[in-house]
Amino acid sequence: MFEQNLTSEALTVTTVTSQDQITQKPLRDSVKASLKNYLAQLNGQEVTELYELVLAEVEQPLLDTIMQYTRGNQTRAATMMGINRGTLRKKLKKYGMN
């Protein structure tokens, strides 16, 4: 097939400041900052199922973007994501994207 040279460092978030400065940072840094912000806003409240909450926040836009990129080709999308096509179909159904 082909050799995949991209690493997780390729997943970056680009932002433009009010002074028109462009910055890029790894996606993981944005996720970490968002989690810290979320936890700071809890004010001592207990939280459950945080893992599922975070996963849903990332997984749904991931699926949407990959399905658009593959023009709805589930086999290609599953291959790109490194998951079984049946697993992809379950995830699409979970988010009402089937």
Swiss-Prot record:
Iron recorded as keyword: no
Q: Extract the DNA-binding region annotation as residue ranges.
A: 74-93
Q: Do you know which Gene3D superfamilies this protein is assigned to?
A: Homeodomain-like
What does the function comment of this entry state? Activates ribosomal RNA transcription. Plays a direct role in upstream activation of rRNA promoters.
- Name the record gives this protein: DNA-binding protein Fis
The alphabetical list of record keywords is: Activator, DNA-binding, Transcription, Transcription regulation
Assembly description: Homodimer.
